């Protein structure tokens, strides 16, 4: 029978000092036999996805205390990728994932907490907490802050839906008037919550649901809606049950590594492909799998991408649907229900509620459930009122979207495309693979061949795009922006947005060893591995080289013979200490980022730290 970890600090005369300190936090004698549950919050006023979380930790803590546990809350950092975008701040985004994972480990292990409730929401916070949870392998439940309502405004006598990406594109489009750009900017992000499309934050919160580590509705129920409060209340109660099951009944099924099994990871990736999620999810799932010591690799993702269709299409791939529409159509479990009927899921998995996947679908799939409370929950809709307050409205759709032929979520028969929303490409400069969000690629450019325009930083590429130096038919190559080379693997949302604003969204390709925002669409290929700074062949591409992209056949090729590539590699190596570094880039890199770069692996490994360099 496992012993409560917290007993290390609460029992025995030699822990009198620790108990004295616990008492100073408000604990009493009656608390020193109860499980100590860490409430891992991420409130900050910097991030709209986290600005409303201040009081939500208290909600969870009250339920933990009422259920027989002791709640202790702490906070992690949280970077807003949208605000950090387009300047040096983006270098810090991906490295913050590792800091978040480490900080959770440090706090939980230093104070011997028995379990966790993770209150996350945005891009690197959910992945960082997920990595920590699987590293620590103690009972955990995730409950995120929820999606933002979609922005709405009237343009040309028509009400349209908006999000952050629209504001960026219109702001950079010289054909858009100042008045219209200002109108879109003021309407794009109306409430608290994670940005309203199927961007990285919402993708990851959907995936924690598919992994079984969060409750039904977690990925899609709006941040502003009163129904979301119940997820927080339930999490506080349920975590105490899970904790006691493990420590008092020796039930290892309560542990995250037994819930988020390899089968669950495969289900999560299947969901991601079917819903056209952010390419960043590939990076984060690979990293989380390594923390769980699960053999889940790019090869597994490639196999799934070849058989899973696209059943859901959401912004930024279309402006017709946002997360509020996904929720109305049944949310994550609506998509999983269709995947299950198509025979594409592993059913031998459970979630934090203790339900198997078939049991969960029976209760929560809106096309089959008889539970009126569930149907009511999925009718939770937007209010259209600007607010930073959680649970501030109780509006509902008049009806559910259960149209699987022409609605937001489709059945296999009526899939948006036979191929899923993500694909892994391989070739002679992406030997370990690269990722493209096919959900955002126009059919006319699924096959594309053109001359390379090579840039050794995102900044240089943006300057060239806005300066008219990139023209129709070009393949923009941005390198030395990988985990090691950036360092930090910047998102390339500005280059892709500016290609659109210059009218080149369907006329050019963009390839990088960096990554893309979940808001990216177009022929944008990222995560090229190995990256340039690790000796990847992408470092050898020159202006004018022909690059051929063939998404249907999962191929990407630099059209040079092996002898020429070998000669260029030899010339690169001859640069000595300067080999595999950018030639003319002016970038100040802090000590903290250099430390990150010294251990960073390429994207095909999830950009995690290279443990082989640590010894032991």
UniProtKB/Swiss-Prot annotation:
Stored InterPro entries: Dihydro-acid_dehy_C, DihydroxyA_deHydtase, DiOHA_6PGluconate_deHydtase_CS, ILV_EDD_C, ILV_EDD_N, IlvD/EDD_N
Residues that, per the record, bind [2Fe-2S] cluster: 122, 195
Cofactor: [2Fe-2S] cluster; Mg(2+)
Cofactor note: Binds 1 [2Fe-2S] cluster per subunit. This cluster acts as a Lewis acid cofactor.
Residues found modified as N6-carboxylysine: 124
Domain of life where this protein originates: Bacteria
Primary enzyme class: lyase
Complex formation: Homodimer.
Protein family: Belongs to the IlvD/Edd family.
Protein name listed in UniProt: Dihydroxy-acid dehydratase
Species of provenance: Salmonella dublin (strain CT_02021853)
The encoding gene: ilvD
